[in-house]
């Protein structure tokens, strides 16, 4: 069976009022095994991280089910699907608390997750299958 994805990249802006370690923790709460790079842009820092770990999406998989948000997650995955990339944006403060919230509207900006995959339909079916009455049907 081929891999579900090639790479996961995560990005967030870190503003002067924020603690970069807390932003890293927020990112790691969603995607484990990240390797970070920071780029200082003066007024803010761009924090990026990548992983090719097979476990990279395991936390999102668990959170989507634990929070009973498979249908919502599926719609955001489909909305962010472009060719061989799926891009979703989540609330940074919610991620710090270990929760997925797709309302990225925040003065601090979102965490952007980019999933690179050769088979986006298969990945979406695994990560956030369609449901009926809250039960996965695919």
Curated annotation (Swiss-Prot):
It comes from Thermococcus kodakarensis (strain ATCC BAA-918 / JCM 12380 / KOD1) (Pyrococcus kodakaraensis (strain KOD1)). It holds the Pfam family RNA_binding. This is UPF0201 protein TK1335. NCBIfam families: PRK00447.1. Transmembrane segments: none annotated. Belongs to the UPF0201 family. InterPro entries: PAB1135-like, Ribosomal_uL5_dom_sf. SUPFAM superfamilies: RL5-like.
């Amino acid at each position: 069976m081929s891999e579900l994805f090639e790479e996961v990249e995560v990005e967030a802006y870190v503003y002067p009022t924020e603690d970069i370690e807390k932003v890293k923790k927020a990112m790691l709460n969603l995607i484990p095994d990240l390797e970070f790079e920071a780029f200082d842009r003066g007024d803010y820092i761009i924090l990026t991280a990548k992983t090719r770990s097979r476990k990279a999406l395991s936390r999102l998989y668990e959170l989507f089910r634990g929070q009973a948000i498979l249908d919502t997650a599926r719609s955001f995955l489909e909305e962010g699907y472009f060719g061989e990339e799926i891009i979703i944006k989540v609330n940074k403060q919610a991620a710090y608390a270990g929760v997925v919230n797709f309302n990225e509207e925040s003065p601090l900006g979102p965490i952007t997750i980019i999933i690179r995959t050769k088979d986006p339909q298969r990945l979406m079916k695994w990560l956030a299958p369609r449901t009926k009455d809250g039960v996965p049907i695919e």
